[in-house]
Curated annotation (Swiss-Prot):
Reactions performed catalytically: sn-glycerol 3-phosphate + NAD(+) = dihydroxyacetone phosphate + NADH + H(+); sn-glycerol 3-phosphate + NADP(+) = dihydroxyacetone phosphate + NADPH + H(+)
Example GO molecular function: NAD binding
Active site, UniProt feature: 202
Protein name: Glycerol-3-phosphate dehydrogenase [NAD(P)+]
Family: Belongs to the NAD-dependent glycerol-3-phosphate dehydrogenase family.
Pfam families the UniProt entry points to: NAD_Gly3P_dh_C, NAD_Gly3P_dh_N
Bilayer-crossing regions: none
Amino acids binding sn-glycerol 3-phosphate: 118, 147, 149, 202, 255, 265-267
Lineage: Bacteria, Pseudomonadati, Pseudomonadota, Gammaproteobacteria, Chromatiales
Xref: HAMAP family: NAD_Glyc3P_dehydrog
Biological role: Catalyzes the reduction of the glycolytic intermediate dihydroxyacetone phosphate (DHAP) to sn-glycerol 3-phosphate (G3P), the key precursor for phospholipid synthesis.
Gene3D superfamilies: N-(1-d-carboxylethyl)-l-norvaline Dehydrogenase, domain 2, NAD(P)-binding Rossmann-like Domain
């Protein structure tokens, strides 16, 4: 169904800067441009940007997908900020603070910021909206987008749906209008905490699913692991202030199922590689892109202990990644836990 003229005009006035030239940032930039949103795309690797300017595609990550006419790759990040009505950040969580620090001195007052990063800040374990509050101030309009999304499927026009969460409904609605299209449905939420935690913790659980499948434990095990993983996720999010219904939605259960069951997931592939005997560094090199769950396992387990939240699956992922536990032994530890009521 065609959009109303008024909404099309709104989109054409919402010049958006996408920060991050990986597969996900590029996919979102293409999505925005297809939606008639004038879009600028910046990446840290200036040689990569220069190549995108010439070829009109991202040969490194999405080589078969041409850029729409309204998508413009750029090399001058600070200069672009003066032309921007909203900013979308799609970088790994380890790069989120450095990018925000770079944006902070040049971003026009109260230009809305949305991020599509699915992780917690490494080292501190902070939610990314806390980093925004620290660097941009308490009144800055911000939102987060999360849900079951693989970049290649999004640019192929395969249908999916996501959640955009913001503390102000107007901000969530504005970003939702920019992203919403014929095959990309956007719902809004006010649960900034729950949406962020769904996107971060599911990465850890996907490593567990990859380990399980890599060891040949089968569909029963995978289904049980996803279900008990969801219980851990809900427990953790509630302790942090998230809402239960958020974790039953797209940014929780939806993304968890996707990431645990499809080999497009880098986190799942990490688990598969570990089950096959690869060391962590070998597996990460083999995958060749950021694997958010590896860093998230550290901060999730540490924060769970601070909050007195029991997360046995996440704990065993941590033990495999950083304490030398064999993947098969980790599964045995989980299976031998004391019998208890399901929702105790």
């Amino acid at each position: 169904m065609a959009l109303p003229v008024a909404l099309q005009n709104d989109k054409e006035n919402l010049r958006t800067l996408v920060v991050g030239g990986g597969s996900w940032g590029t996919a979102l930039a293409i999505l925005l441009a297809r939606n008639r949103v004038p879009t600028l795309l910046w990446a840290r690797d200036l040689a990569q940007v220069s190549a995108m300017i010439i070829t009109r595609r991202n040969d490194r990550y999405l080589p078969q997908v041409p850029f729409p006419p309204s998508l413009e790759p750029i090399t001058d990040l600070e200069g672009a900020l003066s032309q921007t009505k909203q900013v979308l950040v799609a970088v790994p969580s380890c790069g989120f603070r450095p990018i925000l620090e770079r944006l902070a001195g040049h971003l026009s007052s109260h230009v809305p910021l949305i991020w599509a990063t699915k992780g917690l800040e490494p080292g501190t374990g902070r939610l990314l909206h806390e980093v925004v509050l620290e660097l941009l101030g308490s009144g800055w309009p911000m939102a987060v987008m999360s849900g079951p999304t693989f970049a290649h499927e999004v640019v192929a026009g395969l249908p999916t749906a996501v959640t955009v969460a913001a503390t102000e409904s107007e901000i969530a609605t504005c970003f939702a209008r920019s992203l919403h299209g014929d095959t990309f449905r956007v719902y809004t939420s006010d649960d900034l905490i729950g949406v962020q935690l769904g996107g971060a913790v599911k990465n850890v659980l996907a490593i567990a699913a990859g380990i399980s499948d890599g060891l040949g434990f089968g569909a029963n095990t995978r289904a049980a692991l996803i279900t008990r993983g969801l219980t851990e996720l809900v427990r953790f999010a509630l302790a942090w202030g998230g809402q239960r219904e958020t974790l039953m939605g797209l940014s929780g259960l939806g993304d968890l199922v996707l990431t645990c069951t499809d080999d497009q997931s880098r986190n799942r592939r990490l688990g598969l590689a570990l089950a096959q005997g690869k060391r962590l560094d070998e597996a990460l090199t083999l995958i060749g892109q950021a694997v958010e769950g590896a860093a998230a396992a550290k901060v999730v387990v540490a924060r769970a202990k601070q909050l007195a939240v029991e997360m046995p699956i996440a704990e065993q992922v941590y033990q495999v990644l950083y304490a030398g536990r064999h993947p098969r032994q980790a599964v045995e530890v989980l299976c031998r836990r004391e019998q208890k009521p399901e929702y105790a």
